Structure formats: structure tokens, C-alpha cells
Swiss-Prot record:
Protein name, as recorded: Large ribosomal subunit protein uL24
Record InterPro entries: KOW, Rib_uL2_dom2, Ribosomal_uL24, Ribosomal_uL24_CS, Ribosomal_uL24_KOW, Translation_prot_SH3-like_sf
Gene Ontology BP terms: translation
A molecular-function term among this protein's GO annotations: rRNA binding
PANTHER family assigned to the protein according to its UniProt record, in alphabetical order: MITOCHONDRIAL RIBOSOMAL PROTEIN L24 (PTHR12903)
Coiled coil: none
Keywords, sorted A to Z: Ribonucleoprotein, Ribosomal protein, RNA-binding, rRNA-binding
Organism: Mesorhizobium japonicum (strain LMG 29417 / CECT 9101 / MAFF 303099)
The protein's role, per its UniProt record: One of two assembly initiator proteins, it binds directly to the 5'-end of the 23S rRNA, where it nucleates assembly of the 50S subunit.
Record's subunit section: Part of the 50S ribosomal subunit.
A GO cellular-component term linked to this record: ribosome
Length: 104
């Protein structure tokens, strides 16, 4: 089970976007990276094709998982993630900072 998943709210801990937060668009576990909306933006020169216009576009670049932390559901501050088994035997993610169960 992954600690950070698609749709989670995360906070950037290091790098040029330190302190910014956003939603995880995708996670690449093999590369230990994630795409976060509005974070680590890069500019790329796009060649014109039949389906797309040419020009300079800005898009998100992958960011290392070690440089982001899950935002605590209670106060939005960065937290570590733990796992517990509920009474029905289901394994769930828990915010270590507040003890809150994380959705998903």
C-alpha cells in the first residue's frame, strides 16, 4: 500500500516550490516520483501537430516523493503517514500528526 496516492493533498518540503501545496495527479512508484498540480512547473517548446498548437507550454514535472509530505486532514500541515488495521480487518492510512484516518 502506498503512502501517497492520486488525489491526495500534499505539501512540498524541499526545492524551489517549498511550502506550496497541491493535489497529486499521478504517482510513479518505479521512479519514486509524483505529479502535483501547480508544483514544479516547467516550460516546454511544443512543436505544432494536427491536434495541438505549437508554442511554449507550461506543465507539471515529476517531483521526488521524498520532497513532498501528505497534508494533515485537520490543519493542512505536513505529516508522516502510518498504517493501522481497523476492527473489520481493513488496512487504512493514518496521519501521524493528528491520528486522523486518511480517505482512500
Amino acid at each position: 500500500m502506498q503512502k501517497i496516492r492520486k488525489g491526495d493533498k500534499v505539501v512540498v518540503l524541499a526545492g524551489k516550490d517549498k511550502g506550496r501545496s497541491g493535489e497529486v495527479l499521478s504517482v510513479q512508484p518505479k521512479d519514486d516520483t509524483a505529479l502535483v498540480r501547480g508544483v514544479n512547473m516547467i516550460r516546454r517548446h511544443q512543436k505544432q501537430s494536427q491536434s495541438q498548437e505549437g508554442g511554449i507550454i507550461t506543465k507539471e514535472a515529476p517531483i521526488q516523493l521524498s520532497n513532498i509530505a501528505l497534508a494533515d486532514p485537520k490543519d493542512g500541515k505536513p505529516t508522516r503517514v502510518g498504517f493501522i488495521f481497523q476492527k473489520d480487518g481493513k488496512k487504512v492510512r493514518v496521519a501521524k500528526r493528528s491520528g486522523e484516518v486518511i480517505n482512500g
